[in-house]
């Protein structure tokens, strides 16, 4: 009877120990489950950070590409403006040459007109002189008449030359007015081009500053990309480490669950054995 009681006490103690161990294992399992959830949350946080870093890298690269495109477009516009300025400069030079030629023709026409006027005045003076003289000699008269005819011819020729010179002068004046109008237009265009050139110069300076700033931003972007890439690698390493920790915790949880199941089986076996022992005692 004492041996049965001792056995019962031992079994009861073993049952209590098994129950306590099962409770401890269950508590450990809960702690491991909490650690598992915590590690899983950390892993999710790191994955979210990795995605954010990747998004930030993509945004920086897009901004860098956009800045490069704007710089290329600005350089293209500056090149077109310089070509237009060069074309207008050539046109102005041609207009100046045309104006110089027109001025030369006008000077030549004025000289010829002066010569014709002097010849006409000289003929008129000769004619008046001949008219005031009283010459009875027929030969002298004939000579004078011939001189008068010649003078008239010279006067008529001078008048024709004068008319022709006047006509050419009028045409030249019209050409000169047109040339002056074109010159004024050219001067106005030159002013506009100088203003555009000044603006282009300012824009070029701004572009140089923008290019320097773009280079600085590009260097900053490259440094940021390197930093983000390094952070991404670190985050990936930590995420991989977190996954390994989670896997390790999962294995530990599986082991504890197996131990808990084993202890529960052992507890049921001890309980069955106690029930059998109590039944035997009751039968006595």
UniProtKB/Swiss-Prot annotation:
Residues 97-140 are annotated as: Disordered. It comes from the Eukaryota. InterPro entries: Tropomyosin (IPR000533). Residues 101-110 have a biased composition (Polar residues). Residues 1-284 form a coiled coil. The keyword Lyase does not apply. Keywords: Coiled coil, Repeat. Tropomyosin, in association with the troponin complex, plays a central role in the calcium dependent regulation of muscle contraction. Homodimer. The molecule is in a coiled coil structure that is formed by 2 polypeptide chains. The sequence exhibits a prominent seven-residues periodicity. Belongs to the tropomyosin family. This is Tropomyosin. It comes from Echinococcus multilocularis (Fox tapeworm). The lineage of its organism: Eukaryota, Metazoa, Spiralia, Lophotrochozoa, Platyhelminthes.
């Amino acid at each position: 009877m004492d041996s049965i009681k001792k056995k019962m006490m031992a079994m009861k103690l073993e049952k209590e120990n098994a129950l306590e161990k099962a409770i401890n294992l269950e508590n450990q399992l809960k702690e491991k489950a909490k650690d598992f959830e915590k590690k899983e949350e950390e892993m999710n946080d790191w994955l979210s950070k990795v995605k954010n870093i990747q998004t930030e890298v993509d945004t920086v690269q897009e901004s860098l590409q956009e800045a490069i495109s704007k710089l290329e477009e600005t350089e293209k516009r500056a090149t077109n403006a310089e070509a237009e300025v060069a074309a207008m400069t050539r046109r102005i030079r041609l207009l100046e040459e045309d104006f110089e030629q027109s001025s030369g023709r006008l000077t030549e026409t004025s000289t010829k007109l002066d010569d014709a006027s002097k010849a006409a005045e000289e003929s008129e003076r000769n004619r008046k002189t001949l008219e005031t003289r009283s010459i009875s000699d027929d030969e002298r008269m004939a000579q004078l008449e011939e001189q008068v005819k010649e003078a008239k011819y010279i006067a008529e020729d001078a008048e024709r030359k004068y008319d022709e010179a006047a006509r050419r002068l009028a045409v030249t004046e019209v050409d000169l007015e047109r040339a002056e109008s074109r010159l004024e237009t050219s001067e106005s265009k030159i002013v506009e081009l100088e203003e555009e050139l000044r603006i282009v110069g300012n824009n070029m300076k701004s572009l140089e500053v923008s290019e320097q700033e773009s280079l600085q931003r590009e260097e900053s972007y490259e440094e940021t990309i390197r930093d983000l890439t390094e952070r991404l690698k670190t985050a990936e390493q930590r995420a991989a480490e977190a996954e390994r920790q989670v896997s390790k915790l999962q294995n530990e949880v599986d082991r504890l669950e197996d131990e808990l199941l084993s202890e529960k089986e052992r507890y049921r076996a001890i309980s069955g054995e106690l029930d059998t022992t109590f039944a035997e005692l009751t039968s006595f």
